[in-house]
């Protein structure tokens, strides 16, 4: 007799849910397991926050525009999907960034990594922070390490090692630009544990970075243009990030994909789970995988797991808008010889950052055009649209 067919339900059609469905499909096929895979997505499209809009010769990213190419699991997935040849790197000629100060875009000093200088000469030559701020940052070279390595916020770590000016003018906008969050609320261990490890091992973050980068054969030549984030670690696809999610979907052969299908309740049965879809259909399944982490999850699992419901209820969810602007080259006075710029909170602007998308990756716009992508907090959207000088 054939064993009873099992059913696995995956909730959420973003990159996590899609990848899980694809990997389970592979596993069940390889081991000839009699299991049905159902993937439900509440919206009319797959991909979650990964969304690329293509208009004529324009490639516009509404969500993330890149991924870390240092993650082996991502590259392995691309290889299995046969899209590794479609991966493109950032422009090697402009792997640096700027920080807004007043009305000027100041280059991040060459050889500067997120919160710490590596190359000392360019750092002291930069007008980004005052001479007193630079001296305070150099105290990292002599400050003792912490005796106890309990977690602390990114804000506390930066101020302790490098001072308040370094945080306000450099670390806050650069780290905030990555996570779109307040560094005072971000865990150091959860976001940038490498800096804690550098302090623990080398005492000085600056010395630790220099030794680590040299060991990895990183270029510390002070004439190098590289600064800010390590842009060589970012990559995308020739036709945008949706290449990845569409390629996963195209590989589905035994996945029951259901769009416009919102989970409205989850109930535990004696054997398995009863999942209500759109308040009018019940799916009886053996396993449920929740990949859509949003505020509604807490309500859905309140009865079946009060502990995890309480955990999700404590999570803060931020919202960010991305706005694509297309200009003719002659309209922009700046040379755009970098990947983009970030905006410190102390500048009191309505935007968090701006990416020079058509410089960052090739073939995003027709010849003669420029594509800039601006990041705005949801709370600042009204101010941004109402003010002519929003930028």
Give residue ranges: language-model regions.
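Beta1/beta-strand and adjacent pyrophosphate-binding region of the FAD-binding site
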Residues: 2-16
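Short, well-ordered alpha-helices that flank and scaffold nucleotide-derived cofactor binding pockets
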Residues: 22, 26-29, 52, 250, ...
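Short, well-ordered coil/turn residues at beta-beta hairpins
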Residues: 70, 160-161, 291-292
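Conserved Rossmann-like nucleotide-cofactor binding loop
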Residues: 16, 45, 295
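Dinucleotide-binding Rossmann-like beta1-alpha1 core, especially the glycine-rich loop
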Residues: 56-145
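Mid-domain catalytic core of redox enzymes
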Residues: 259-387
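Active-site/ligand-binding neighborhood in enzyme catalytic cores
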Residues: 96, 135-265
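Glycine-rich FAD pyrophosphate-binding loop
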Residues: 25-54
């Amino acid at each position: 007799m054939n064993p009873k067919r099992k059913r696995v339900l995956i909730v959420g059609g973003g990159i996590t849910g899609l990848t899980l469905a694809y990997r389970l499909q592979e596993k069940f096929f390889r081991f000839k397991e009699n299991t049905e895979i159902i993937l439900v997505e509440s919206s009319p499209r797959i991909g979650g926050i990964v969304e690329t809009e293509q208009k004529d010769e324009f490639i516009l990213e509404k969500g993330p525009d890149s991924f870390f190419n240092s993650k082996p699991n991502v590259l392995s997935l691309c290889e299995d999907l046969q899209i590794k040849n479609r991966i493109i790197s950032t422009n090697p000629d402009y792997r640096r960034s700027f920080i807004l100060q007043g009305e000027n875009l100041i280059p991040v000093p060459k050889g500067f990594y997120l919160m710490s200088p590596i190359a000392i000469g360019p750092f002291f030559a930069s007008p980004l922070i005052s001479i007193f701020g630079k001296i305070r940052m150099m105290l990292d070279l002599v400050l003792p390490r912490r005796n106890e390595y309990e977690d602390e916020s990114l804000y506390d770590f930066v101020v302790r090692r490098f001072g308040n000016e370094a945080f306000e003018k450099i670390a806050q906008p650069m780290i905030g630009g990555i996570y779109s969050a307040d560094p005072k609320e971000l865990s150091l261990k959860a976001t940038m544990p490498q800096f804690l490890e550098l302090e623990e091992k080398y005492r000085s973050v600056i010395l630790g970075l220099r030794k680590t980068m040299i060991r990895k054969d990183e270029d510390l030549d002070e004439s190098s243009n590289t600064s800010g984030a390590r842009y060589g670690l970012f990559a995308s696809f020739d036709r945008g990030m949706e290449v990845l999610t569409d390629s996963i979907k195209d590989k589905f052969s035994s996945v029951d994909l259901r769009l416009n299908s919102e989970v409205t309740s989850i109930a535990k049965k004696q054997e398995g789970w009863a999942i209500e879809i759109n308040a009018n259909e019940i799916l009886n399944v053996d396993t449920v995988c929740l990949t859509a982490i949003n505020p509604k999850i807490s309500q859905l699992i309140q009865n079946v797991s009060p502990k995890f419901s309480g955990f999700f209820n404590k999570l803060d969810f931020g919202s960010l808008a991305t706005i694509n602007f297309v200009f003719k080259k002659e309209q922009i006075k700046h040379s755009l010889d970098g990947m983009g710029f970030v905006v410190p909170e102390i500048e009191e602007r309505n935007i968090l950052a701006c990416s020079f998308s058509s410089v960052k990756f090739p073939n995003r716009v027709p010849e003669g055009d420029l594509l800039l992508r601006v990041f705005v907090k949801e709370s600042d959207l009204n101010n941004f649209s109402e003010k002519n000088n929003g930028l």
